[in-house]
A protein has these predicted regions:
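Bacterial N-terminal signal peptides that target proteins for export
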Residues: 1-8
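N-terminal signal peptide c-region/cleavage motif recognized by signal peptidases
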Residues: 15-18
Length: 346
């Protein structure tokens, strides 16, 4: 029995139908018994870079848009998810996702593990996150541990080793890191490091490619981040010429886009929160037998933003246990830039 099958067997044994009913960790289920985010959070670093086992779900989520020495654009994803299967926090499971996107190909990897045996985990000081041989590890000799990272992952047909250096501060979404996700008040704790300069090496079927570009790390944890009626989301992280950044998302229910939010981030890390974000699908593509909106119009009137985003590769489908679309995009219009789009529930 191979390692992935063993991991999947463990996962399905530990994860009840209820937990899996709304995607990873049952994101829309009641949080009864688990810790819940509260307004006016007080973060403590580096401790809060580490896990919070009394919350149901948590992730360390990095994406990067890279330019190769061959002139091509590439995208990279590295994600580690943690889920507590009981409120006591004594039964944890971990899931890792990695992706490499080129204009013509998309490579996906997935790892599954249970906690407490060393196969996967996160430490806050020194900072390290890992599952099997995939790792995100601090290289910082002073300051915040996330200021400098090394990232590694190996997939069936691709691999990467990347060094990341932050040239800006951590930023906090919502109200100082308390990020509301619905009109009913479901929320998460959510902060990011959106200012990474990235360089390193991709290993692809065509050969090794040296790359450099920009990266974005999201840190988020909660116990019920979605309303029970919400079944999908569309999430953007964009970096614009001139240095401003945008994090924006829309959450969907049967009536359509039910809740939106945006963080407008200046070059010095100042965040302006807004709920006037408008997301409009412009073009759909048949991906994995589904109609997926791969080009979007994004409007944020409070910042004079009106842009169109276009996918680098329509086929950026993560065919994982809980499948979704994740890939690099370019932005044009009132602002020019690039970034990442994640879509679930299609």
């Amino acid at each position: 029995m191979n390692a992935k099958l063993i991991g999947l067997t463990v996962w399905l044994t530990l994860a009840s139908t209820a937990v899996m009913s709304q995607g990873f960790a049952g994101l829309g289920q009641t949080a009864e018994g688990y810790a819940v985010p509260t307004p006016e959070p007080s973060f403590s670093f580096p401790a809060d870079h580490g896990p919070h086992p009394d919350f149901r779900v948590e992730w360390w989520y990095l994406t990067a848009v890279l330019e190769g020495e061959d002139g091509e654009t590439y995208g990279v994803q590295w994600t580690l998810f943690r889920s507590a299967l009981r409120p006591e926090g004594d039964v944890q499971v971990w899931m890792g996702h990695a992706g490499v996107t080129t204009p013509d190909e998309h490579f996906t990897g997935e790892r599954l593990a249970r906690g407490e045996i060393g196969q996967a985990g996160v430490t806050s000081q020194p900072f390290a996150a890992w599952i099997d041989d995939w790792s995100m590890q601090s290289r910082a000799v002073e300051g915040d541990p996330l200021d400098a990272l090394q990232l590694r992952a190996s997939l069936d047909q691709a691999a990467y080793t990347l060094d990341l250096n932050a040239n800006g501060p951590l930023v906090f979404h919502g109200d100082k890191g308390f990020s509301i996700k619905s009109n009913s008040g479901q929320a998460s704790y959510y902060y990011s490091q959106p200012f990474y300069e990235v360089k390193g090496l991709l290993r692809l079927p065509k050969g090794d490619v040296e790359v450099k570009g920009q990266g974005w790390l999201d840190r988020e944890w909660s116990s019920q981040p979605l309303d029970a009626d919400q079944f999908g989301w569309d999430w953007f992280s964009l970096s614009f010429e001139g240095g401003n950044r945008l994090m924006g998302f829309g959450l969907r229910d049967v009536s359509g886009m039910s809740f939106t939010y945006a963080s407008w981030v200046t070059l010095d890390g100042e965040v302006t929160s807004s709920n006037d974000l408008r997301l409009t699908p412009l073009r759909t593509a048949q991906v994995a037998g589904r109609d997926v909106p791969v080009d979007w119009r994004i409007e944020l009137p409070s910042q004079g933003l009106d842009i169109t985003t276009s996918a680098l590769n329509d086929e950026s489908w993560q065919a994982t246990l809980f499948p979704y679309w994740e890939g690099p995009v370019t932005a044009s219009g009132t602002h020019e830039g690039q970034g990442y789009l994640e879509m679930t529930g299609y």
